[in-house]
């Protein structure tokens, strides 16, 4: 165990996602201390050795070591990447039974250390497991965050930017709802340079509208395509987790589409779901309730109902 000298991030689960996330943290100089925790201690130790050998090339060398749950006591942020992976043909919701029990053990072990920081959940189905983390930890809802639709939104902006030949950073568009098959695009509020995307395609005809629909389908189904080709997705989500981590540790008050607890916004209660939220050192400062059109409202409530149906099997509502 190291002596705290700055921001500490504990990464639980050093598989593809956890190791890629730790690598992103180191390369971007986001954290001062990174502790790697895994049931396979040799894997965590090997990763720590590998990262330390590259420390001389990092913009801000962090202390990196393999540890155990006691190291979470002084952590500012615990990021859970552990759990069963999604296999070809499986949906994210198929993973619930496998991962609920794993999460109970992880979260209870973290809390037993005296941990008083924030949780960030990456494991799928992320909305369900973020809710489970909140329940198992007993922490205030704003201190438990899921990666939500941050990657879906990034995919959406990339594909729209590619279609319109503009930088994705200049595309303002959100994917909200479940990080999964019932997610939805907020076309009514999507714009490029202040010009609504719907207006941009008006003059392009029916084929342009069909292309937008194809873009969303490619966003929604991206994980299936990547899993089929290479077995797992990890680089994109690792970079998304690093972005959320920076917003937290640097107290940015950044708006990101994370899995946040709703207790009224969007007409929903008692569910974690992907929505834009203001993120800072204290966790979720507030949920941003963007205006949805009637069709988007219908699809958002359908997405929330899907998640609640799963939650009802495990938690008393």
From Swiss-Prot:
- Where mainly located? cytoplasm
Alphabetized SUPFAM superfamilies for the sequence:
LDH C-terminal domain-like (SSF56327), NAD(P)-binding Rossmann-fold domains (SSF51735)
Gene Ontology CC terms, in alphabetical order: cytoplasm
Mark the residues carrying the PTM Phosphotyrosine. Answer: 224
Q: Which residues form the active site?
A: 179 (proton acceptor)
Question: Pfam families per the record?
Answer: Ldh_1_C, Ldh_1_N
Report the top EC class in one word. Answer: oxidoreductase
One Gene Ontology term of the biological-process aspect is:
lactate metabolic process
Q: Which residues bind substrate?
A: 86, 92, 124-127, 152-155, 233
Query: Keywords of this protein's UniProt record, alphabetized?
Result: Allosteric enzyme, Cytoplasm, NAD, Oxidoreductase, Phosphoprotein
Catalytic activity, EC: 1.1.1.27
Q: Which HAMAP family match?
A: Lactate_dehydrog
**What is the official name of this protein in its record?**
L-lactate dehydrogenase
């Amino acid at each position: 165990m190291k002596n705290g000298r700055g921001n500490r991030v504990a990464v639980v689960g050093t598989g593809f996602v956890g190791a890629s996330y730790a690598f992103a943290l180191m390369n971007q100089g986001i954290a001062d201390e990174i502790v790697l925790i895994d049931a396979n201690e040799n894997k965590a130790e090997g990763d720590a050795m590998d990262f330390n050998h590259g420390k001389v090339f990092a913009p801000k060398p962090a202390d990196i070591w393999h540890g155990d749950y006691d190291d979470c006591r002084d952590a500012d942020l615990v990021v859970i990447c552990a759990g069963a992976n999604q296999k070809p043909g499986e949906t994210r919701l198929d993973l619930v039974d496998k991962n609920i029990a794993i999460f109970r053990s992880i979260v209870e072990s973290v809390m037993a250390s005296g941990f008083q920081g924030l949780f960030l959940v990456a494991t799928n189905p992320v909305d369900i497991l973020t809710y489970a983390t909140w329940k198992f930890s007993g922490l205030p809802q704003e201190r438990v965050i899921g990666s939500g639709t941050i990657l879906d939104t990034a995919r959406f902006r990339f594909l729209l930017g590619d279609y319109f030949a503009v930088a994705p950073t200049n595309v303002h568009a959100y994917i909200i709802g479940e990080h999964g098959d019932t997610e939805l695009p907020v076309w009514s509020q999507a714009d490029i340079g202040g010009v609504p995307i719907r207006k941009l395609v008006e003059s392009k005809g029916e084929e342009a509208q069909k292309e937008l629909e194809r873009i969303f389908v490619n966003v929604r189904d991206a994980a299936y395509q990547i899993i089929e080709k290479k077995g797992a997705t990890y680089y994109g989500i690792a970079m998304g987790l690093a972005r959320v981590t920076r917003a937290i540790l640097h107290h940015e008050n950044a708006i990101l589409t994370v899995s946040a607890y709703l207790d009224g916004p969007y007409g929903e209660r008692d569910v974690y779901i992907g929505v834009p939220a203001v993120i800072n050192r204290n966790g979720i400062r507030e949920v941003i309730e963007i205006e949805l059109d009637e069709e988007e409202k219908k699809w958002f409530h359908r997405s929330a109902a899907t998640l609640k149906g799963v939650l009802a099997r495990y938690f008393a509502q």
